[in-house]
């Protein structure tokens, strides 16, 4: 899954943003589970990138009064 830019998030529909947010949350849970189980993540910076992308989506949702 690619990290989304703010401009890409703004062009999405409400449903697409909600779906992407849910997918990212699930991916974050999987990455954290892998780390907590003692496994080494493929890309250690991925967790931070996922968190920032989730924050971007939520920020835009608040700006557009979707929440």
UniProtKB/Swiss-Prot annotation:
Cellular compartments per GO CC: ribonucleoprotein complex; ribosome
A GO term, aspect molecular function: structural constituent of ribosome
Keyword Metal-binding: no
Pfam families noted in UniProt: Ribosomal_L29
GO biological process, one term: translation
Gene3D superfamilies listed in its UniProt record: 1.10.287.310
Keywords carried by this UniProt record: Ribonucleoprotein, Ribosomal protein
SUPFAM superfamilies noted in UniProt: Ribosomal protein L29 (L29p) (SSF46561)
PROSITE patterns hit by this protein: RIBOSOMAL_L29
UniProt keyword annotation of Transferase present: no
Homology family: Belongs to the universal ribosomal protein uL29 family.
Protein name: Large ribosomal subunit protein uL29
